[in-house]
Curated annotation (Swiss-Prot):
Organism: Chelativorans sp. (strain BNC1)
Pfam families: Mur_ligase_M
Predominant cellular place of this UniProt entry's protein: cytoplasm
Catalytic activity: UDP-N-acetyl-alpha-D-muramoyl-L-alanine + D-glutamate + ATP = UDP-N-acetyl-alpha-D-muramoyl-L-alanyl-D-glutamate + ADP + phosphate + H(+)
EC number(s) reported in the record: 6.3.2.9
InterPro entries found in the cross-reference section: Folylpolyglutamate_synth_CS, Mur-like_cat_sf, Mur_ligase_C_dom_sf, Mur_ligase_cen, MurD
Subcellular compartments: Cytoplasm
Record pathway: Cell wall biogenesis; peptidoglycan biosynthesis
Signal peptide extent: none
The protein's name: UDP-N-acetylmuramoylalanine--D-glutamate ligase
NCBIfam families: murD
GO cellular component: cytoplasm
Gene Ontology molecular functions: ATP binding; tetrahydrofolylpolyglutamate synthase activity; UDP-N-acetylmuramoylalanine-D-glutamate ligase activity
Amino acid sequence: MIPATTFHGRQVALFGLGGSGIATAQAIMAGGGEVLAWDDNPESVAKAKAEGIKTGDLRDADWRSIHTLLLAPGVPLTHPHPHWSVELARSAGVEIIGDIELFVRERRMHAAHAPLVAITGTNGKSTTTALTAHVLKAAGRDTQMGGNIGRAVMTLDPPVADRHYVLECSSYQIDLSPTLNPTAGVLLNITPDHLDRHGTMENYAAIKERLVAGSDTAIIGVDDEYCRAVADRLEKAGRKVSRISLTGTLEDGFFADGTQLFRAGQGKAEPLFSLEGIGSLRGRHNAQNALAAAAACLACGLSPAEIQTGFRSFPGLAHRMEQVGKLGHVLFVNDSKATNADASAPALSSFPRIYWIAGGLPKAGGIASLRQYFPRIAKAYLIGEAAPAFAATIGEATNYEISGTIAAAVQHAARDAADDPAGDVVVLLSPACASFDQFRNFEVRGEAFRDAVRALPGIELIGEKRA
């Protein structure tokens, strides 16, 4: 735990006791501050009480004595309208921050030069965060990873000079972190998302920009118009910017040509290394993740050789193109995190011949946008409520069956793929659907796929179960 010593002797209101809320309250208390915590969910309040946290309805609090409101990232700050606790704090002139800002202040107080990599983007930030942390650890660096992935930030070990921190930051967390100042800030991409919470694309992009605007080195993917504009603004302001791109060569920055990564500068481009043969980084989208992680690790002082070694041992993230096992020439891949068609596209574009398990609770638009990948699909195995609609979309473009369940789909796909004379093929769970018709969440769905694969006679499992 990181004691929040910067709030010693101060009274803090905290709203939001799910997720990181309890850890944040405990950090305030450990640092000598006083917390009054609340949540609209009575069960969360009861859990906090059981942890020894003082609770009370913030509507009844004396806001004249409160120094700060700590807000959970899931609580609306502005859109669609401010939460009532936000309105109370603003009326009283009380600052409103989140747990990432709490960490930033502790780092500034106790180890201002402890390397901090903060990563955001609409897509790819979890993989980039995990990859960056893995490479740093593999190179022998004392490394802590958390934020919007894994551990709540205040449960990490306290800042010391040589301890590296790698934090995934959502737009909600950035919005509550006014003084975020990473050693390396990474902005991967900006596409429409969370507009119900941020109002407009311009506001959403402006929030994302804050992370890199405060960075010593701003690492920015420039393959979309919003990020290009951010990079241009920061460069004009004299900030250090490392551009990354998948769509073409750069005069200064990092780019990819297929699986080969390059670093460009001073009028020349030099190869860094290749991603060829690294199964956990397969696919064009992972080339961007790898470029960003490489740039961040270089900013932290690693050599290209150390980065390449770390890449080659990266196990990947669970449920994101996760290689589960192999049976002869058939690879089994769990991409359960793909809960809509856009999220399935990277996996479908990464393999030449696919036995595709898809379906679940359908999203608007179905799989019509994936038609360009149908020639890659040897056969589709459709599950859940979406099966009839997906069958209608596929039509005669490729073979399909309505399997109903993941267990049946894995058995049938394994049988059919084993008989495929084409050579290496993949059985891919990439549902393009939510999971809630058959499973509690996409993680449970992914576990069901893993279990079905493990049950196949002769299967050679790949790696260990990852969180």
